Amino acid sequence: MLFRSPFVGAGSVFLNTDFSRYILADINSDLISLYNIVKMRTDEYVQAARELFVPETNCAEVYYQFREEFNKSQDPFRRAVLFLYLNRYGYNGLCRYNLRGEFNVPFGRYKKPYFPEAELYHFAEKAQNAFFYCESYADSMARADDASVVYCDPPYAPLSATANFTAYHTNSFTLEQQAHLAEIAEGLVDRHIPVLISNHDTMLTREWYQRAKLHVVKVRRSISSNGGTRKKVDELLALYKPGVVSPAKK
């Protein structure tokens, strides 16, 4: 069975499932480039990245030098090395870009950022059965067939109209795209391809996923821009399973 994820993100579902093959996509080209480099050049990558995880690099001056280098670099390998450093040393683990496509997360001021060497090797081993593509969710899902299962973990819909959200990439995910994702899922399940979507449990998401079988789980999430406020919120799992979905609205 082929597992397809149009929003691979950090890859936690990929790393904790056991399918024979994976097709994993994301709109963030830096992320996909890193994954492909870790997959193909594991030892070289780990050695280069380890050199940045030293006490001398854990200061604002060096961080901003590396951030500037990352934004100017055209070398995929060097960018991938710096991308991991910026993710670990940047504020709150954010991945954020300005409208010019420049990484703009400030320095995080952590005592000793963790170098994930064992996790990189585990990822590389698991990735031998995976293919990574930089593409939109629509393009990724368009290639799904009846040998696939599709899991979608999109940027979550706001919990309220005043919720403070920052763009994961320069292409922020709009409410129209959220609704479009649900329409694509409906089209796939009508072709006997199962789809699971996770999102916040709101009136809007319930409207979007009204043809799906809905399950509610409680998860602990940061609910402020500084990451300091955490509480349990309801998360919605919308399962589009052939033979189970509600009929389309007339």
Question: Which positions does each model-derived feature cover?
Answer:
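Conserved SAM/SAH-binding beta-strand->alpha-helix loop
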Residues: 28
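Class I SAM-dependent methyltransferase core
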Residues: 5-7
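SAM-dependent nucleic-acid methyltransferase catalytic core
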Residues: 39-166, 180, 187-191, 233
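Conserved acidic-Pro-Pro-aromatic motif
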Residues: 146-234
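Short alpha-helix immediately C-terminal to the canonical SAM-binding loop
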Residues: 32
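Short, small-residue-biased leader/transition segments that mark boundaries at the very start
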Residues: 1-2
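Conserved SAM-binding loop of SAM-dependent methyltransferases across substrates and taxa
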Residues: 10-21
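Flexible, glycine-/basic-rich loop-and-beta segments that form/coincide
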Residues: 242-250
